[in-house]
Amino acid sequence: MADLLPEHPEFLWANPEPKKSYDVVIVGGGGHGLATAYYLAKNHGITNVAVLEKGWLAGGNMARNTTIIRSNYLWDESAGIYEKSLKLWEQLPEELDYDFLFSQRGVLNLAHTLGDVRESIRRVEANKFNGVDAEWLTPEQVKEVCPIINIGDDIRYPVMGATYQPRAGIAKHDHVAWAFARKANEMGVDIIQNCEVTGFLKDGEKVTGVKTTRGTIHAGKVALAGAGHSSVLAELAGFELPIQSHPLQALVSELFEPVHPTVVMSNHIHVYVSQAHKGELVMGAGIDTYNGYGQRGAFHVIEEQMAAAVELFPIFARAHVLRTWGGIVDTTMDALPIISKTPIQNLYVNCGWGTGGFKGTPGAGFTLAHTIANDEAHALNAPFSLERFETGHLIDEHGAAAVAH
């Protein structure tokens, strides 16, 4: 019987005691931190690396997202990094030698108003210019892709069409983290759990290490990949980040036979739904409007999301919700990430992904690793510098991002 069970994730990597010093310390053991460690080792030959996680590996937003992967963003800069990320997703199962159930089942982004229609068609054309696969579908074509959706005109927000990205899809989030962790461990990276960073060692305006609950660790370079707690880490280091953290809720239903063949998203009414490989419906809601670090949210957000979901999918009316939870999303004013050097020498930051963090996992790791190794940004993340908030060179991606998952 034991031979039939999946390998316990802790057997996939070592759990060493932290060494006194490393070339690079990455704060945050989620998808982005692990991907950064992997690409540092693979692309740049830097293996004397520690990934520090204050809890268990990938127990933060990596364990709490709705697993949607897409790249159909409006502006050139965001389309560039998300399309790079999607191309990396497509090769990672073979590269990491781990089946994390990447399913390119397509993503529909619904339009409910004439304004939605105009913006959606604009985005489809922009995607085509950037080499991103995108189509505009009529309501009847939407019904062909997703037969269970209600395209009647007698609901509050009738479906007037949708954008469709066939290469988009979902993946098993826990397995993604385990795959990166296993491969990084094989390359010599130390993955250290239950090790919270409580402060930074500095020599003037240069970081030289971190203080943790498991002792002091010296480092040549330090990277922050703490998602919703990035502003807290930055404050400990002595600078500010222009981000706000909000709870973002999601929920799952009981198990069903396969009924939902794709991923459906509606920014207008904040319904984001797919069916996981085991059969449960995975649904995302809108963010709670208040700032906070709690991993749960207000019930009315879920209530409104469920009402809208049942209108779009009448078949869900008798489904039972098993559990709800929340993650902490760190949002910037232009709805795009910060992957950048900081005012502190040898300290780098990757944050501000908002609700796009999971889909950007490989791209974030790829570009942050390049930035750390070369002390300068890759062309893909150069537009996402911290300085853009001083110069005013923002990239307003709210039309394609907002709180979309």
UniProtKB/Swiss-Prot annotation:
Which UniProt keywords are given for this protein, alphabetically ordered?
Cytoplasm, FAD, Flavoprotein, FMN, Nucleotide-binding, Oxidoreductase
Cellular component, GO, one term:
cytoplasm
EC numbers for this chain = 1.5.3.24
Q: List the disulfide bonds.
A: none
Recorded hits in SUPFAM superfamilies, A to Z, give: FAD-linked reductases, C-terminal domain, FAD/NAD(P)-binding domain
GO molecular function terms attached to this record: nucleotide binding; sarcosine oxidase activity
Q: Name one GO biological process term.
A: tetrahydrofolate metabolic process
Q: According to its UniProt record, which reaction does this protein catalyse?
A: sarcosine + (6S)-5,6,7,8-tetrahydrofolate + O2 = (6R)-5,10-methylene-5,6,7,8-tetrahydrofolate + glycine + H2O2; sarcosine + O2 + H2O = formaldehyde + glycine + H2O2
Q: Using the record's annotations, give every residue carrying the modification Tele-8alpha-FMN histidine.
A: H173
Q: Tell me where it resides.
A: Cytoplasm
Q: Which cofactors does it use?
A: FAD; FMN
For this protein, the record's InterPro entries field holds: FAD-dep_OxRdtase (IPR006076), FAD/NAD-bd_sf (IPR036188), Rhodanese-like_dom (IPR001763), SoxB (IPR006278)
Free-text cofactor note: Binds 1 FAD per subunit.
Q: What is its main location?
A: cytoplasm
Quick one: which residues bind FAD? G31, H32, E53, N61, M62, T66, I68, V197, G354, G357, K359
Function per UniProt: In the presence of tetrahydrofolate, catalyzes the oxidative demethylation of sarcosine to yield glycine, 5,10-methylenetetrahydrofolate and hydrogen peroxide. In the absence of tetrahydrofolate, catalyzes the oxidative demethylation of sarcosine to yield glycine, formaldehyde and hydrogen peroxide.
Query: How the protein assembles, per its UniProt entry?
Result: Heterotetramer composed of subunits alpha (SoxA), beta (SoxB), gamma (SoxG) and delta (SoxD).
Family classification:
Belongs to the SoxB family.
Q: What is this protein called?
A: Sarcosine oxidase subunit beta
Read off the lineage from the record: Bacteria, Bacillati, Actinomycetota, Actinomycetes, Micrococcales
User: What is the gene called?
Assistant: soxB
